[in-house]
Amino acid sequence: MYQKSLLFSLLASSALAAQFPIPDSKGSVTFDEPYEIAAGETYDGGYKTYGRGVSCTGQSEGGQDDTVFIVQEGGTLKNAIIGSDQIEGVYCLGACTIENVWWEAVCEDALSLKGGSGPYNIIGGGAQGADDKVIQHNSGGQVNIDGFTVYDFGKLYRSCGNCDEQYARTVTIKNVVANSGKTLVGINSNLGDTASIDSSTCATDVKKICVEYKGNDTGAEPEEISEGPSDACQYSEPLSSC
């Protein structure tokens, strides 16, 4: 009887540990159009849930008009929950800070970096349920991801593999908690991309940690070159389990 009780307790603890730690919502807001955060301004969402009142269209490509928030150069979005009733999540059109922002269910992408040259700072927060990418990096420059939590995902970060204009992009990842994913990071090493993953990051049931692709500007599907630690994918394996 004691052994059965102990087993039940361990299973219950494991289940609780695997729950996505999204904060409790303080209310809900539905926008008729994207909410624009002006250059240099900060929007504090007060941990309310924000959406667009629409159904996710899966991996069908949306656009800027489908976003919940648009952040202009130097803007900050913080303390917000992005609901499941949206298509494109958040766009940064220049350097931005995304702090303690949570996605309850990713649709096409959670966060798209579309303009400027950074830096783009993602601090805290988290996302779950991404069939493909969580953070899509189309512009150039530096991305810093610190303290983000990601569950049930395709890729946490992907440097655009086939954009019309390509750049050498850099991403640093630390204090990230990753659970049940296909790839943590995807970069285009032939274009000069680099990824640095600190040992403070943990990964449980993540198939690939860092994948190098042959990026292009033709729109073709990029070819996977290699995976694992290298000059471009800078980390020590294995990462610890979460």
Curated annotation (Swiss-Prot):
Q: Which UniProt keywords are given for this protein, alphabetically ordered?
A: Calcium, Carbohydrate metabolism, Cell wall biogenesis/degradation, Glycoprotein, Lyase, Polysaccharide degradation, Secreted, Signal
Q: Which residues form the signal peptide?
A: 1-17
Catalysed transformations (reactions): Eliminative cleavage of (1->4)-alpha-D-galacturonan to give oligosaccharides with 4-deoxy-alpha-D-galact-4-enuronosyl groups at their non-reducing ends
Q: Which cofactor does it need?
A: Ca(2+)
Q: What is its EC number?
A: 4.2.2.2
- One GO molecular-function annotation for this sequence? pectate lyase activity
Cofactor descriptive note:
Binds 1 Ca(2+) ion per subunit.
EC top class, as a word: lyase
GO cellular-component term (any): extracellular region
Question: Where found, per UniProt?
Answer: Secreted
Residue positions the entry lists as glycosylated? 216
| GO terms for biological process, alphabetical | cell wall organization; pectin catabolic process
Cross-referenced PANTHER family: PECTATE LYASE F-RELATED, PECTATE LYASE H-RELATED
Q: What is this protein called?
A: Probable pectate lyase D
Q: Which gene encodes it?
A: plyD
